[in-house]
Design a protein with these regions (language model features):
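Structural micro-motif
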Residues: 44-54
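Short alpha-helical
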Residues: 12, 37-38, 68
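Short secondary-structure transition/capping segments
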Residues: 40-44, 64
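Non-catalytic, surface beta->alpha helical segment in thiol-disulfide oxidoreductase systems
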Residues: 55-83
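Thiol-based oxidoreductase modules, predominantly thioredoxin-like and allied folds used
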Residues: 27-39, 48-50
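Local sequence-structure signature of Cys/Sec-based thiol-disulfide redox active-site neighborhoods
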Residues: 1-24
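Surface-exposed charge patches
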Residues: 19, 41, 71
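ATP/adenylate-binding site constellation spanning eukaryotic-like Ser/Thr protein kinases
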Residues: 8, 48, 66
Length: 86
């Protein structure tokens, strides 16, 4: 499962998200929204106004969500692209 964290500098929730992803042993890509205008527009297009925004497989969320990070680790271990069952 591919995981991308869209974040900004000096963001407490972003740092907490990185720590939780690291704790779960998940690989992820960081994108700094202050340096990538296209990424910022993409995130705004999804309806988000605050960082971090995490895209994990087919799912995405905003803010520090340890419950969804744990679900992402479980989904990754099972080889699925869905974090949340629809």
């Amino acid at each position: 499962m591919s995981i991308t964290v869209y974040s900004k500098p000096m963001c407490v929730q972003c740092d907490a998200t990185y720590r939780a992803l690291d704790k779960q042993g998940l690989d992820y890509t960081k994108v700094d929204l202050t340096e990538d205008p296209a990424a910022l527009e993409f995130i705004k297009g999804l309806g988000y106004q605050q960082a971090p925004v995490v895209i994990a497989g087919e799912d995405h969320w905003s803010g520090y969500r340890p419950d969804l990070i744990k679900a992402a680790a479980q989904a990754s271990a099972m080889g699925t692209a869905r974090v949340v069952n629809a």
